[in-house]
Amino acid sequence: MSKLFSEYKLKDVTLKNRIVMSPMCMYSVENKDGIATDFHFAHYVSRAAGGTGLVILEATAVQEVGRISEFDLGLWNDEQVPALKKLVDGLHYHGAKAGIQLAHAGRKAVLPGEIVAPSAIAFDEKSDKPVELTKEAIKEVVADFKRAAYRAKEAGFDVIEIHAAHGYLIHQFLSPITNRREDNYGGPAGNRYKILSDIIKAVKEVWDGPIIVRVSATDYAHGGLQLEDHIPFAKWMKADGVELIDVSTGGLVNVAPPVFPGYQVPFADEIRRGAGIATGALGLITRGEQAEEILCNERADLIIVGRELLRNPYFAKDAAKQLGETIEGPKQYSRAWK
């Protein structure tokens, strides 16, 4: 059997294969209330029907002010749970495990009213200047990640991913470009890591399942985080109880990274080896053979697929065919599956 279609355990959760749907914002909430819609159900459940092992929902705001836009999913109140529970049941029906990415946009929020960040530095000249978070407000952010994790548990999710990448709030704390604080949340790397550590520990108080963290392994900017900075971060995450790091790049500043097939895989490889922690690789992974090479050469443990799954909900089926495998599909599709 190919490695791509072997089982993988995240703590006590067994994935049927190593294909993960990357969290990708859909901006499709209809009433600006954070509640999942029929679109979200069809969108995510179709990828489970297509054979994906773990489907991770898009960035889901833990605070209303933490949305990227007014059309983001949310878990800041109990009314948002039932629609997500229905969605999770749909994923489970097709044999996929269900993950959710908990997030706070920080200074990248595009919302009416006040936005917040570690320091009062705007994303760019066109963006609103954020208000610097007080220590009390930081503690409330941490508490709201915990509350959202509890609601994720109530909805039946198997995996929680904490979004610490792409220039959103936690990434803003991690990077010296955006964190100019002079208290115990700023300055040395250990201080800049503090909010993420606090969030992980708070989530674990209500959540005993696996925790993934998405990071941006380079800021693509002078004075920003580079790969070598993420090795100690990854070691600290492992010590805090994180199971796997989802390794992306960029998003902190307004610069386009160089993009080519597998362009982020070396970052996942280096963090995996340098910190001794499992990683997920992503970045223009489009074929089964490409995914299999990454796994067999032990460059990552999971394959996280984004845009290719937008183009093709049946990526897993096609990847299996490319690798000479046959995977089970929905029984309703059996006459056309093989």
Curated annotation (Swiss-Prot):
Transmembrane segments: none annotated. It holds the Pfam family Oxidored_FMN. The keyword Flavoprotein applies. FMN binds at residues 22-25, 59, 101, 214, 306-307. Belongs to the NADH:flavin oxidoreductase/NADH oxidase family. NamA subfamily. Homotetramer. PANTHER family: NADPH DEHYDROGENASE C23G7.10C-RELATED. The gene is namA. It comes from Listeria monocytogenes serotype 4b (strain CLIP80459). Catalyzes the reduction of the double bond of an array of alpha,beta-unsaturated aldehydes and ketones. It also reduces the nitro group of nitroester and nitroaromatic compounds. It could have a role in detoxification processes. Keywords: Detoxification, Flavoprotein, FMN, NADP, Oxidoreductase. Its cofactor is FMN. It catalyses: A + NADPH + H(+) = AH2 + NADP(+). This is NADPH dehydrogenase. The lineage of its organism: Bacteria, Bacillati, Bacillota, Bacilli, Bacillales. Its EC number is 1.6.99.1.
